[in-house]
Regions:
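N-terminal intrinsically disordered, cationic/polar leader segments
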Residues: 2-147, 151-180
């Protein structure tokens, strides 16, 4: 059984955490500010540079919220301090992506270019025609934008063409063999 909720969270230098009475947590750091409201069942305490998360009862839902709250808080602190980044790769002949202002334009085998608008708080870059870098301070939003980009053309199992994460392994299938 996981004990994620019982682990303490260390607050690095340059990051400030403000906990309001209604369990709204504001985390400010060199990269920006994140605000989130947590369940009143969970108590969040800060003592100097250490944050602890505790639950009021041993109910199953409270145990689940305990671990989730701790993980979300740790991600908020890491995001404003270091930030998050997801890298995608475009595989396929003639497939490419480029930025036009705040819009990512993908030419990936459809009869029309696919345009994806950038979100507030998330930066999309194209260091080359076949590489896309999504970065920001919110792990959730960075992952969501990267997933939306990948969803436009998922990698197919026969040739591996499509948009994939850099560290993703595509399970390949063998094509049909010709009959006699």
């Amino acid at each position: 059984m996981s004990r994620v909720g019982n682990k303490i969270i260390n607050v690095p230098e340059g990051v400030t955490v403000d906990i309001a009475a209604d369990n709204t947590v504001t985390v400010t750091g060199p990269k920006g500010t994140l605000v989130r409201q947590f369940s009143p069942v969970i108590t969040i305490k800060q003592e100097e540079n250490v944050i602890t998360v505790a639950r009021s009862t041993e109910q199953k839902t409270h145990k689940q919220l305990h671990g989730t709250t701790r993980a979300l808080l740790a991600n908020m602190i890491e995001g404003v301090h270091v930030g998050f980044k997801k890298e995608l790769e475009i595989v396929g002949i003639g497939y490419r992506g480029q930025m036009k202002g705040n819009t990512l334009v993908l030419n990936i085998g459809y009869s029309h270019p696919v345009e994806i608008e950038g979100e507030e708080g998330v930066t999309i870059e194209t260091p080359s025609n076949t590489k896309i870098v999504v970065s920001g301070i919110s792990k959730e939003r960075v992952g969501q934008v990267a997933a939306q980009i990948r969803e436009v053309r998922k990698p197919e199992p026969y040739k591996g063409k499509g948009i994939k994460y850099v560290d993703e392994r595509i399970i390949r299938k063998e094509g049909k063999t010709a009959g006699k």
